[in-house]
Amino acid sequence: MQGSARDFLKPKLVESSQTGVNEFKVILEPLERGFGHTLGNAIRRTLLSSMTGFAVTEVVIDGVMHEFSTIDGVQEDVLDILLNLKEVSVVLNTVETAQVVIDKKGPCEITVADIETNGIDITTFNPDKVIATINDEGHMRMTLKITAGIGYDAAASRTDEASSIGGMQLDASFSPIKRVSFTVDAARVKQKVNLDKLNIMIETNGSVNAEVAIKRVATILQEQLSSFVELELVEEEVSLPTSEDFDPQLLAAVDELELTVRSANCLKAEQIYYIGDLIQKSEQDLLRTPNLGRKSLNEIKEVLTEKGLSLGTNIENWPPVDLMSE
């Protein structure tokens, strides 16, 4: 008789701590022997290749037609400026692409903090990063295109996209994850020895914390492996609940709460699509969501209260099987 997956130990997130500037350590245990390296490799590769983020993908600098130019009154040449722009760490909170402007006269250093948002809801995570240095007679105006994406996108792959006149395409590293490593130590549970403890060290660009990143990776891996699940391994035939078994209020889309755009986008980024998904989250869960602050949390609580609902509610057998298949 084949063993059930239920016989395996289920690991827990036992530690999530910050060890330095944008550096985090996450510990998962206990894991069955060998699963430390199996999950460690999968998590590491997915963190580096498949996380969503934002990057500067195109720049137009007034008076500059190509990247091999120099600019009067500017210390750096254009190639150096482009390299600096690749390291700009920002997040667009309400849109997936936007154009922003930097317009400065010398003498001064141009930094990420000099980006003019023009009403766009944008958060910068390395405002002191120097982009260029201008002398007494220097003047620089540039238009940056910031775009959402996944992983790494070479400029050459965007040759078919419409570019601005004088626009220079940049290789874009969208991932908010800069570095990932892991180690596997021995662990034990009561009399059971030879188990694994997985230690994951993560360095980010500041736009995401480690615990949120791990949860996103787990969701990605779960979705990718879902087609391989063998339903015949389930030991008992269980009658799965359908939408008819739940309060219709719980089946309504989060959009029906008429939240602000920022709050709604934050929830969708965490794959919270239905009110039933939302009310099972605690306040702490929501506050760990990137870009969702106390103001957005209070808004969500107020709207739920008006409907007689509250956060931290446990819904047995959620979600209904027909909702999962949509």
Curated annotation (Swiss-Prot):
Keyword Transport found: no
Region (Alpha N-terminal domain (alpha-NTD)): 1-232
Reactions the enzyme catalyzes: RNA(n) + a ribonucleoside 5'-triphosphate = RNA(n+1) + diphosphate
A biological process term (GO) from this entry: DNA-templated transcription
MF terms in GO: DNA binding; DNA-directed RNA polymerase activity; protein dimerization activity
Region annotation Alpha C-terminal domain (alpha-CTD): where it falls in the sequence: 246-326
Keywords: DNA-directed RNA polymerase, Nucleotidyltransferase, Transcription, Transferase
Gene Ontology CC annotation, any one: cytoplasm
HAMAP family attached to this UniProt entry: RNApol_bact_RpoA
Domain comment in the entry: The N-terminal domain is essential for RNAP assembly and basal transcription, whereas the C-terminal domain is involved in interaction with transcriptional regulators and with upstream promoter elements.
Recorded family membership: Belongs to the RNA polymerase alpha chain family.
Quaternary data: Homodimer. The RNAP catalytic core consists of 2 alpha, 1 beta, 1 beta' and 1 omega subunit. When a sigma factor is associated with the core the holoenzyme is formed, which can initiate transcription.
Record-given protein name: DNA-directed RNA polymerase subunit alpha
Gene that encodes it: rpoA
